[in-house]
């Protein structure tokens, strides 16, 4: 693998019927109430969760990764967690909703056990938390007004055109904008980004292609379209995108056990697609086995 300076790189089965997703705690209650994780000095988090039989995940409501639908927590990362944690003897997945930018702080504050958001593995994030091995490859896309009147195709075209850009707070696209000198409008959720475009407050909303296409397909009457997905480039350097589950750095036993189960899924394309395919994921999103979390945390391509 070719290496580069960390600042140069920016990275944005069977279903277990007993892997029940339990009630979701609203963000306000979760942020002010008691913590979700209580371990004694002699027990690892893995042991505690196995004894409890449940794991609490932080999520930001970004479809199709982790979101609420008909009162239940669902999505590709949730499906992976049902499978993996179920195989570890942890049968129930509970969710705490939080803004994307509050997920790692919430994890550090013990408000949930792991983050289930398909979060991009970035060097600066690796300084704050531990990541699983990659679960998804990422590409970026743009949501624009129907007809794409500004002919926007990638992040550089947004910068060159002076288009008003919306990005989600804490998402990798915000970093792309900063590095390209774009003063982007920050939004809290994907829905807020689409609303910014449809209301005329923004010309374009940048997010992962899988998320934007999911939104468009589920809002067919919205007067927007989604560009072809692309790999963003900053100063001529392709920005390799891969995401994973986030853990506290102290929870190594849980992370190691999780990665062992994850490898059984990502090494088997048929199994991988049987878990995440219903959410619009294809073999294009299957992680490159040559690209590891260690590489991404170090800033290597």
Predicted regions and their residues:
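Acidic, polar ligand-binding/catalytic clefts
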Residues: 82, 95-158
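Extended ligand-binding regions for polar small-molecule ligands
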Residues: 35, 78-87, 148, 156, ...
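C-terminal motif of bacterial Sec signal peptides marking the signal peptidase cleavage site
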Residues: 28-33
């Amino acid at each position: 693998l070719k290496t580069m300076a960390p600042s140069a790189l920016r990275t944005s089965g069977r279903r277990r019927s007993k892997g029940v997703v339990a009630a979701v705690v609203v963000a306000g209650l979760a942020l002010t109430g008691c913590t979700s994780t209580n371990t004694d000095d002699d027990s690892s988090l893995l042991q505690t969760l196995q004894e409890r039989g449940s794991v609490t995940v932080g999520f930001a409501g970004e479809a199709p990764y982790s979101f609420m639908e008909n009162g239940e927590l669902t999505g590709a990362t949730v499906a992976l967690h049902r499978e993996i944690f179920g195989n570890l003897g942890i049968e129930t997945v509970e969710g705490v909703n939080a803004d994307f930018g509050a997920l790692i702080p919430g994890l550090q504050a013990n408000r949930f056990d792991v983050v289930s958001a398909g979060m991009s593995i970035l060097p600066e994030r690796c300084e704050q938390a531990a990541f699983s091995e990659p679960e998804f490859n990422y590409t970026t896309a743009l949501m624009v007004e129907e007809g794409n009147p500004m002919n926007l195709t990638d992040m550089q075209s947004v910068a060159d055109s002076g288009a008003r850009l919306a990005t989600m707070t804490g998402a990798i696209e915000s970093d792309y904008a900063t590095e390209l000198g774009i003063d982007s409008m920050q939004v809290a959720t994907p829905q807020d980004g689409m609303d910014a475009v449809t209301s005329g407050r923004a010309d374009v909303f940048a997010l992962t292609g899988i998320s934007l296409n999911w939104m468009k397909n589920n809002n067919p009457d919205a007067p927007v379209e989604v560009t072809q997905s692309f790999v963003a480039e900053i100063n001529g350097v392709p920005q390799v995108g891969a995401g994973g589950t986030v853990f506290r750095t102290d929870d190594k036993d849980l992370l190691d056990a999780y990665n062992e189960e994850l490898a059984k899924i990502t090494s088997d394309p048929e199994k991988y697609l049987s878990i995440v395919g219903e959410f619009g994921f294809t073999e294009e999103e299957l992680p490159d086995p040559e690209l590891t979390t260690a590489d991404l945390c170090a800033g290597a391509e």
